[in-house]
């Protein structure tokens, strides 16, 4: 009786761990993909790859005075009043999950002479 119960429990635990690994890979994909507005993004740690934000938001960095110094961080935002942005400001058109679709919202425009 115990052998059958133990085997069932062991199989259940294995099934759960497989599902857990899938969840971890999905979380990693989400972190490397587009981030919801209001979510934390990486603007200071890796300026060469500013993470993409959904709905044409930008990874905006802020610096807020506190009692003992400043609170700094970066969040996906649509507001322009944050202090500075990532060097490579990027957004994902249409809320895409694919970071390769992210592009600079301020491309250099050619000036046409008259």
Swiss-Prot record:
Positions of the UniProt region annotated as Disordered: 95-114
Cell compartment(s), UniProt: Secreted
Organism domain of life: Eukaryota
Bridged cysteine pairs (disulfide): 34-53, 41-59, 50-86, 52-76, 61-74
Reported tissue expression: Expressed by the venom gland.
Alphabetized GO MF terms: calcium channel regulator activity; toxin activity
Keyword Disulfide bond listed: yes
Propeptide: 16-32
Signal sequence bounds: 1-15
This protein's UniProt keywords: Calcium channel impairing toxin, Disulfide bond, Ion channel impairing toxin, Knottin, Neurotoxin, Presynaptic neurotoxin, Secreted, Signal, Toxin, Voltage-gated calcium channel impairing toxin
Coiled coil: none
Entry's Gene Ontology cellular component terms: extracellular region; host cell presynaptic membrane
Biological role: Inhibits voltage-gated calcium channels (Cav).
Domain comment (free text): The presence of a 'disulfide through disulfide knot' structurally defines this protein as a knottin.
Family under the similarity heading: Belongs to the neurotoxin 04 (omega-agtx) family. 03 (type II/III omega-agtx) subfamily.
Name of this chain's protein: U10-agatoxin-Ao1a
Species the sequence originates in: Agelena orientalis
